[in-house]
Amino acid sequence: MQKGNIRIAIDKGGTFTDCVGNIGTGKQEHDTVIKLLSVDPKNYPDAPLEGIRRLLEVLEHKTIPRGIPLDISNVRSLRMGTTLATNCALERNGERCAFITTKGFKDSLLIGDQTRPDIFNLNIKKVVPLYDTVVEIDERVTLEDFSEDPYFTKSSPNEQEGILEGNSGEMVRVIKKPDESSVRSILKVLYASGIKSIAIAFLHSYTFPDHERIVGNIAREIGFSHVSLSSEVSPMIKFLPRAHSSVADAYLTPVIKKYLNSISAGLSHAEDTHIQFMQSDGGLVDGGKFSGLKSILSGPAGGVIGYSSTCYDKNNNIPLIGFDMGGTSTDVSRYGDGRLEHVFETVTAGIIIQSPQLDIHTVAAGGSSILSWKNGLFRVGPDSAAADPGPAAYRKGGPLTITDANLFLGRLVPEFFPKIFGPNEDESLDLETTTLKFRELTDVINKDLNSNLTMEEVAYGFIKVANECMARPVRAITEAKGHVVSQHRLVSFGGAGGQHAIAVADSLGIDTVLIHRYSSILSAYGIFLADVIEENQEPCSFILGEPETILKVKKRFLELSKNSIKNLLSQSFSREDIVLERYLNLRYEGTETSLMILQKYDDQWNFREWFSEAHKKEFGFSFDDKRIIIDDIRIRAIGKSGVRKEKTVDEQLIEISHFKKADVSKDASFTQKAYFDNKWVDTAVFKIDDLPAGTIIEGPAILADGTQTNIILPNSQATILNSHIFIKINQKAAKTLSKSGYELDIDPILLSIFSHRFMDIALQMGTQLRKTSVSTNVKERLDFSCALFDSKGNLVANAPHVPVHLGSMSTCISAQAKLWEGKLKPGDVLITNHPDIGGTHLPDITVITPSFSSTGELIFYVASRAHHADIGGILPGSVPPNSKELYEEGTAIYSELVVKEGIFQEELIYKLFVEDPGKYPGCSGSRRFSDNISDLKAQVAANTKGIQLIGSLTKEYDLATILKYMAAIQTNASESIKKMLAKMVEHFGTTKFSGEDRLDDGSLIKLQVIIRPEKEEYIFNFDGTSPQVYGNLNAPEAITNSAILYCLRCLVGEDIPLNQGCLKPLTIKIPAGSLLSPRSGAAVVGGNVLTSQRVTDVILKTFNVMADSQGDCNNFTFGTGGNSGNKTDKQIKGFGYYETICGGSGAGADSWRGSGWNGSDAVHTNMTNTRMTDTEVFERRYPVLLKEFSIRRGSGGKGKYTGGNGVVRDVQFRKAVTASILSERRVIGPHGIKGGQDGSRGENLWVRHSTGALINVGGKNTIYAQPGDRFIIKTPGGGGFGQYKD
């Protein structure tokens, strides 16, 4: 041992703590590895300290008693990673803290982005913020200019008027400074209440932090132990994620500091030891700078560093996929081009985190994921048995899990597992109980299917479905970002990774799997190898390409670099060991999606070229005519640790002089029966440490040791190297139906797999659409849907985007399929939005792409529907509140080819969007035609993505199989709906149900449902519904179809495929010419966003499920400009904005579904789930000041269960605009049921700045607002359920 040179790295996970130590030689053969339980209070109080003690005993060759401070004078480096912050966030046991924010915004984190996390869960469960209490400070700043200004007006600093230049270069208007005396009084009261940690987040503090600093300094003077300023924690635009991040820091960092102090107390003579911690960005930092916010992904980040450092070869530059499978989840990541991939906004434990983190995707499928059979499908997760009780085999009464399936199929080696199971933790794995539970589950499945599946086939089916679940996030980080997944190598690590890695790789088309010798402790090993990182970032708002920009940016780079280098030099790094990475966070003007672009070469300034390349790769396009904005300047200084450099896999392969196939009789420890490809096979079990480098093992085989089990499939070959296992997969030809030894027309395993794959296609289409669009509606508010259809237009899979699109898209596609039957050619793409042919309201533009087989047969369709912010009509935003005729709402497209044989028809689109709607009296063409074009191209790109993914599927399965399961998945959904409706009849003892409600204008929606399961009759009859109105509340039939589909999916209460099968058993009767089936030419814009909500309320009330929700979308639009559509007429430049506003959800009823529930506050319900634009983005883009966005307390109807509260949204205009509101429930409040009180009605108020007049504008109106005018929208609360008792 070299005195004073010991290196130690530790990763404390939820179950195990992994430790690596080296005596100082840096050679791998001198490493010592220890794995111990993270929680074992009978033997030690703290796992990392115990790990250090055990390592020192080995490395220093002496006995060290427990319970005394550990002398680490011989330890040069002590590095740690921990899941402490993540666990605190998940378990909600962090430090009590307060949230200090701008007046009017105390409820910001409660409202969030106004969406609900699960659109099909009627009992909405929003994430509860981490703070204990919230305090508002009367302060305010805003941005003086707005980016949507068609005349690009730029202000200059003017201190007298309170206009100052912010850190970003943007002009900031200081409206109200905080009163320090008042602040001091407020904080003293807060301090006296016992709160000692606070988070401060004020609007626009990313560029103007002065007010936060004033309040922060006062807080420190008073004695608060931790003060988190959002402007320091995350100086980036977007108030919501920045505020969440500051609160997370205040909640987690004190816990981290206490833990670090406890570690320090357990150590002695640490003066010369570098004690560092792994951050979420993959870099190490001194303990004094380690924060809760930056430790969220501490452990997983170590794994990324581990595999990237040991498995990437810069000579061949083959990118890697990290596959880290643990007990409760699987983490996947990507490493390519020798660089870590970072993201700057993620969600952990439901909390938005805005901080540099490695791009790691997690799926709820791990060794302890629970296996279940529901609605004819094999389910894996998301529920987990966790460590306690754990899998059934752990002898603690746990359920069947993936681990049990592997054990039952002979894919685990019980002899290699320690005897730590059972109540006394002294028994081996329990195969007997696992077998019994699989027998019971197999009997249930066979009864449901009238089949003869074996237990092995069932267990193997669950393994296949689990593998598909884990393949999905891999596609998300590769295909969804423009990478070809099959061109990667997959690196397996984690406790369960080796059991599934080859199968997952095979399903993805990857032919190489790498497993490092330290795969079971790779996170700890990555921490051992990691570099030290110093990050510095500042906001800015410069225009790339302007002459002064380069000088300004280089100056800032220099200032940030000096600080970072200084900090690393103080940690004993030489200047030669420090590498600087310079980044600019860039976006196109008018968009909000930015990319962090690295300066590739120190002597080059080609950021425009680098950004365009990155944008084209990520999103599929770039702009030549848009200016590029610099949002942030970032420096990442890397202190190279130089701990060790491992030889690459390819170098190791070259060095081996002799390869030898393993002799099972001599080299294997023993053989055991294992189940592969539907049969039991004698499978050799090898101890990894017994195999010399150069040994080749043909699958099937099991390579294992005390910490890992690696399954080598029959189509694979493993080569043992000095530090890796190198596995090649013989890629199979296209798969056909599984020959499983039983005769079933539909294989339930394949049905489960195709359910995942079809949904994955729709989800990836949505990802592509969001990435490639430019409008706020699509990119920020997520007002779009994507889906896959069969050749008749029947819905096969619809991603859970916007509920009102769900059933209506199928009506649209099937109508187009009939209209164009036999006429479409490859390269054709359709466009439509007309309510007569399956459209909903005109702004929802549907783009449809047919797909053809190699023989020219049309085999399916993909489609995307997106809300366009302006398509012409009488008002900006194309959502006029008082439209009477369809033409007033904008362009109405019955059916056209937007792409004809591969050629985008831009002239036709101009005619449709600008010329045609502008011909009508009082109407304009589209006011944002460039956005229309961009979003249409994005929709075409999303459809193209869907067709490409189906093409990939045809390489795995033959076309006949795919088409067969497209039909089967619809049948499965149909059967699930029929079972649910039959249960309802059985519970209520009746076959007839009825409900009704009236709109604010008195129009009646009436429903009678007749369910006779024995006759297969399921009738939804809307006879008695009022006639269509001379207004825009008319709802095309497709909308009612959507409402029924949505409600039925919610009532099932379980995860079933969402497709046309849900509606196939039903007979839907809607009287022609009624409100729900208007004649051609009727105005419909309100039908989609208002009547749809009320139809949903009626259906849910009919089945006694819940009281009315707000029954409204609160559609708010404003803007300026327009044109007649005539190219020779002068166009008035302008802009348009559209948003929908949340309200209260109805209380749940005590019913056949179980006990009721309280409604949720401030959330979108029923047929919409679009996001609210972030306040800072809202004020940056438009000439507005948001005065208040808060919960409207007391607006929910009281009852046994209380309805959720609505919100108050107070918008002040800073320029003259036309503003409109289209809303309901302003006359008749949301109804309570069974004695529950009604929710409060909504209210829309106009405050005129010139006179101070307060005017109620009613539910549907347009105003012509002047600067200083305010529009206050108070949204309805939800109805209550049951009698209220004080």
Curated annotation (Swiss-Prot):
<keyword id="KW-0963">Cytoplasm</keyword>
<comment type="function">
    <text>Catalyzes the cleavage of 5-oxo-L-proline to form L-glutamate coupled to the hydrolysis of ATP to ADP and inorganic phosphate.</text>
</comment>
<keyword id="KW-0378">Hydrolase</keyword>
<keyword id="KW-0547">Nucleotide-binding</keyword>
<dbReference type="GO" id="GO:0005829">
    <property type="term" value="C:cytosol"/>
</dbReference>
<dbReference type="GO" id="GO:0005524">
    <property type="term" value="F:ATP binding"/>
</dbReference>
<dbReference type="Pfam" id="PF01968">
    <property type="entry name" value="Hydantoinase_A"/>
</dbReference>
<dbReference type="Pfam" id="PF05378">
    <property type="entry name" value="Hydant_A_N"/>
</dbReference>
<dbReference type="InterPro" id="IPR049517">
    <property type="entry name" value="ACX-like_C"/>
</dbReference>
<dbReference type="InterPro" id="IPR003692">
    <property type="entry name" value="Hydantoinase_B"/>
</dbReference>
<feature type="modified residue" description="Phosphoserine">
    <location>
        <position position="1077"/>
    </location>
</feature>
<keyword id="KW-0597">Phosphoprotein</keyword>
<comment type="similarity">
    <text>Belongs to the oxoprolinase family.</text>
</comment>
<dbReference type="Pfam" id="PF19278">
    <property type="entry name" value="Hydant_A_C"/>
</dbReference>
<dbReference type="Pfam" id="PF02538">
    <property type="entry name" value="Hydantoinase_B"/>
</dbReference>
<feature type="modified residue" description="Phosphoserine">
    <location>
        <position position="930"/>
    </location>
</feature>
<comment type="subunit">
    <text>Homodimer.</text>
</comment>
<dbReference type="GO" id="GO:0005737">
    <property type="term" value="C:cytoplasm"/>
</dbReference>
<dbReference type="InterPro" id="IPR008040">
    <property type="entry name" value="Hydant_A_N"/>
</dbReference>
<protein>
    <recommendedName>
        <fullName>5-oxoprolinase</fullName>
        <ecNumber>3.5.2.9</ecNumber>
    </recommendedName>
</protein>
<dbReference type="InterPro" id="IPR045079">
    <property type="entry name" value="Oxoprolinase-like"/>
</dbReference>
<dbReference type="InterPro" id="IPR002821">
    <property type="entry name" value="Hydantoinase_A"/>
</dbReference>
<dbReference type="GO" id="GO:0006749">
    <property type="term" value="P:glutathione metabolic process"/>
</dbReference>
<dbReference type="GO" id="GO:0017168">
    <property type="term" value="F:5-oxoprolinase (ATP-hydrolyzing) activity"/>
</dbReference>
<keyword id="KW-0067">ATP-binding</keyword>
